[in-house]
């Protein structure tokens, strides 16, 4: 009986997530260039096979294909986002990565990119574990940093920081840079590089946990 209840709850959650992100992309509209895209492209070898999880409307995918000549696959739960990504000439698939990422065999891709994605899923650690098996060379992630100095001030004065694009319920997980480092190390990754993509450069490079607004991680499974 408990197993049937779990299945029903899981299917219900998937359905609600699907509806939420269809509306999300309709309300948000198109994305644009982001500093983190340049960081990711510097980490990715030219010609690599790349899976972009939560690819959205494909702006990053187009940037990556044009600049690194990669074999690109984008995935997203939103058909609205995927239609826009397809219009950019990208190879994309419909995928609920919080449940179905394990459809790919180990070593299927050189790199997996999760750009401002992992905070949107409830089972972040499990998704990261699976990504570590699928990626040959590394998993590239960016997260919003809840310990950014402006957010600390907002909390000090009793206000929760606004990190979302459309609605507060889109973010299910929150990390500081130091918290995320502990999380990924606990599930078997080594951190090859950390780079903040927003904020004053000299400060964000020295103290990313304080002065990095969005922070990029180059992760490698310890077995690689």
Q: Where are the language model's segments positioned?
A:
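A SAM-dependent methyltransferase catalytic signature shared across enzymes that methylate proteins
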Residues: 178-197
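A short glycine-rich, Lys/Arg-flanked "PGG" loop and its adjoining helix->strand segment in the class I
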Residues: 126-140
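Active-site micro-motifs of SAM-dependent methyltransferase domains
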Residues: 99, 119, 148
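A short SAM/SAH-binding and catalytic strip from SAM-dependent methyltransferases
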Residues: 113-122
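Acceptor-substrate binding/catalytic loop of class I
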Residues: 162-179
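Conserved N-terminal segment of class I S-adenosyl-L-methionine
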Residues: 2-111, 128, 173, 194-224
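Conserved class I S-adenosyl-L-methionine
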Residues: 140-162
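Short N-terminal helix/helix-N-cap motif within the alpha/beta-hydrolase-1
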Residues: 122-126, 151
């Amino acid at each position: 009986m408990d197993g049937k209840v779990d299945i029903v709850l899981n299917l219900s959650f998937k359905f609600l997530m699907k509806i939420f992100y269809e509306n999300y992309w309709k309300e948000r509209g198109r994305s644009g260039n982001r500093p983190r895209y340049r960081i990711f492209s510097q980490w990715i070898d030219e010609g690599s096979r790349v899976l972009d999880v939560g690819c959205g409307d494909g702006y990053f995918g187009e940037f990556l294909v044009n600049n690194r000549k990669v074999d690109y696959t984008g995935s997203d739960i939103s058909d609205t986002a995927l239609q826009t990504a397809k219009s950019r000439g990208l190879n994309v698939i419909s995928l609920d990565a919080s449940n179905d990422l394990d459809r790919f065999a180990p070593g299927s891709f050189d790199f997996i990119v999760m750009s401002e994605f992992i905070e949107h899923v409830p089972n972040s650690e499990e998704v990261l574990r699976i990504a570590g098996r699928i990626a040959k060379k590394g998993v590239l992630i960016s997260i919003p940093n809840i310990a950014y100095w402006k957010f600390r001030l907002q909390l000090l004065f009793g206000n929760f920081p606004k990190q979302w694009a459309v609605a507060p319920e889109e973010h299910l997980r929150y990390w500081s840079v130091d918290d995320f480092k502990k999380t990924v190390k606990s599930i078997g990754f080594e951190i090859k590089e950390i780079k903040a993509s927003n904020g004053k450069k000299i400060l964000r490079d020295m103290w990313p946990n304080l002065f990095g607004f969005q922070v990029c991680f180059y992760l490698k499974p310890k077995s690689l």
